Amino acid sequence: MKRHRPVSSSDSSDESPSTSFTSGSMYRIKSKIPNEHKKPAEVFRKDLISAMKLPDSHHINPDSYYLFADTWKEEWEKGVQVPASPDTVPQPSLRIIAEKVKDVLFIRPRKYIHCSSPDTTEPGYINIMELAASVCRYDLDDMDIFWLQELNEDLAEMGCGPVDENLMEKTVEVLERHCHENMNHAIETEEGLGIEYDEDVICDVCRSPDSEEGNDMVFCDKCNVCVHQACYGILKVPEGSWLCRSCVLGIYPQCVLCPKKGGALKTTKTGTKWAHVSCALWIPEVSIACPERMEPITKISHIPPSRWALVCNLCKLKTGACIQCSIKSCITAFHVTCAFEHGLEMKTILDEGDEVKFKSYCLKHSQNRQKLGEAEYPHHRAKEQSQAKSEKTSLRAQKLRELEEEFYSLVRVEDVAAELGMPTLAVDFIYNYWKLKRKSNFNKPLFPPKEDEENGLVQPKEESIHTRMRMFMHLRQDLERVRNLCYMISRREKLKLSHNKIQEQIFGLQVQLLNQEIDAGLPLTNALENSLFYPPPRITLKLKMPKSTPEDHRNSSTETDQQPHSPDSSSSVHSIRNMQVPQESLEMRTKSYPRYPLESKNNRLLASLSHSRSEAKESSPAWRTPSSECYHGQSLGKPLVLQAALHGQSSIGNGKSQPNSKFAKSNGLEGSWSGNVTQKDSSSEMFCDQEPVFSPHLVSQGSFRKSTVEHFSRSFKETTNRWVKNTEDLQCYVKPTKNMSPKEQFWGRQVLRRSAGRAPYQENDGYCPDLELSDSEAESDGNKEKVRVRKDSSDRENPPHDSRRDCHGKSKTHPLSHSSMQR
């Protein structure tokens, strides 16, 4: 059908926006469908294309239009298909629909899922073995890094590329691996050559060093085992290398008949078990199926249980089957290979009937036969063999040492460079550095071989019941040790706690005692250093005192007139104890104390205790209260050396002792009372008696001091009891005596009278000639009269003191007597 061009009102239809419906009518006519009166949805418009066209004469900027150069320009004349009524085009409506969860209708059971290849790994997982193999086994140290920096500078000057750290680590690893592999091969080759050309090499089966034509000795090129052709069943020696059965399969099995590995082994019928050919020959129950090929080994099951139960006398292992000594009376068992290693006598005897008999002897019978052989042959063949063996060993060790020193000759730089794909120059630098570093490390490898690392790993083993029982037994023993340690630690801590508590109690009692003495205004008799450190032992010193002035002689004569000169004059003390001493004499005695001559002082030491007790009981209160001058002069002005010297004087006297004195015993009533009084209240007695401070105090110390060893061996308990007793006595000392019963006061006076009538206890600690008595009997009688006159004058001049001092003097007497009576 011919297409007609529609009539246009303009000259150029391209410029008029007319619309042609001819094509639509044409399509409607052509379609011949029932809906021919229906309006079309699309129409073709040409005006859009005509509006885009420009005439060729129209001048336009070349940048503002496009030039069509294709050949399908005429197709644009047909028009563009557009919707007939754009307003009636339906608008799409959208809504979001929730995703529907798919119901799982079938779940594949996991028990039916199996991995076909155990080596394959799932995607996303890492194979640890592959990762470990890919990691380099050598790490650079600081020296390597510094050297690598210098190498890169030299390579940059040469115009070569640098070498990074990872590449150097891989190069060193390859060098070590090549060196290790080539050294192992060289050692095997050297060992094989040594065995092959050694005249003393023997067959591993028959133990014979001889060979003959057609029965040559063959060596395995891998394990270097030496066998005869007939012994191992080699029908024809192959050209080139030869490997034994186990080396062909690449395994290293263990013999079922002995605990040894390696050697000339053959398999059984099943092919799963291996046994030495020598073991199969020497054990009578075992046989070989094909003697020509010497395989397979059969009748292992015919070995009786009694043979399996035998224990080897050489290796002490109950493994495999043992043979016994051929001597009928000997039952010693041993493995065949153990007998070969220890050099036992193993004989192969060919019988008349072409039967082979095997004779084996234990260590004892082999030595007897060797001794008989040495008697027949005087040549020391054994010594020569040992020397040859030692020479062979030393030669082999020397070869190995030379091989280790020349390790660098086993590595080729070209092979390493080809394997790593590196330039030969860089590899050669690293090779020389590796050689120097290994030389500085005594030719030792820079890291251990891989085989050693794998062997060093702990392989899991099947735990048997015996192993578990042994483990539990060791665990129980360890727990028992822990329990004992815990008990010992707890006991130690308890002892430390009790020790600390005792020390705390001692410290508290000491502080309490010191506080009470300070409150009472008394001197600190028991100071801290006296309780913690015991007094030193008594020492007798030889002193030379300077000559005194006339005033000192006058003062000393005044003092000596008031005291007895010897123990014989003790009766005069009792006769004048009721007399009063003038106050002037008291002051004069106190002031002139530091300048006493030692000769006159020694005369008064023996009678000072009795005189002080009598004066403390019956004298006036003026005798019981010391003055401040006496306190400061008597207790604080004595050096330690002088006290020690006078302490030794107290037991000398006139060089005589009283054998009838009851104070020689320290465990009686009176003796213990005197010791307790003089020891505990020595400071108070010095003030009450108005005597020199060292007289009664040191006499009491001389009667109750023990040796140094006894003082230092006192326990904490004894020390605590001593402080407790001192505190109790001090409390009795401070308390007033109003509450004391007349009976207790009476007993105290009786004990005081008894102790005053006796001389103090004397100990012969030593003799000092410079401190001897110097006054005579006549002088002492004259001094007695002067003492009586001064006492009468003091009674008339000095009034009695207050009752408080009197009570204070009584409190020093009665508590002491009361405590002594209780003891």
Swiss-Prot record:
A zinc finger (PHD-type) spans 200-250, 310-366. The keyword Nucleus does not apply. A zinc finger (C2HC pre-PHD-type) spans 252-286. Residues 650-664, 673-684 have a biased composition (Polar residues). Residues 1-32, 372-395, 542-576, 609-630, 650-684, 758-823 are annotated as: Disordered. Keywords: Acetylation, Metal-binding, Phosphoprotein, Repeat, Zinc, Zinc-finger. Ubiquitously expressed, with highest levels in placenta and uterus. This is Protein Jade-3. It comes from Homo sapiens (Human). The gene is JADE3.
